[in-house]
Amino acid sequence: YFRVGYTLSKALDDGPDALVVGRSGNVQNSYDANAERGFSADDQRHRFTAAWVAEPRKFELSQSWLNGLVNHWKLSSIVTFGSGRRLNATIAGDPNQDGNTYNDRLTNSRNAFTGTDYFSTDLRLTRNLKLSDRVKLDLLIESFNVTNRTNKRVEISDDGFFNSAGQFVAYSTNPVGMNGKYYPGQYQVNETFLEPTNAYAPRQIQIALRLNF
């Protein structure tokens, strides 16, 4: 069989999922919680998946050993493509002097930036062995990301839920100071702003046995 799925979505919220453990719920301005409304950390605009299974018909050959060799095979695959996930850019430090560091933004909204896309193909080859009328054994060899595509991500926590997205925007090396405080403040973009610093898993291969009874 062959199945295809496509999702076009847009997710907005005013904070991380309540089930995400260890994620800060601090807002930039405690007097204006509505300003936190923006793209959700798990917002992904496009997602495409295709799955197929190929199981050839049974061949009736003259030699029994040939029948056992060419029959009872199955090949299946899942192809996944997803557009980039959301990233949040903040300023290192505490420019609004509220005592809460690493949550202040410039003029951008929360999760205003987008990371790199994702593409992966998984492949499985299965051989079915009939041990008895009630017992069957499946021999499987599977490969995840079989094409070994380098799926980059901006930082290791960028997985759609655990998404802090790093402090991309830093203080200028020559800020305007007043009594030791930054006012009004000059900022510069880090050289690594939105540059991928990590990657999802490369090609992986595993062999398995599954007993059905």
Feature-to-residue mapping (PLM):
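Short, solvent-exposed micro-motifs at the edges of structured domains
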Residues: 1-213
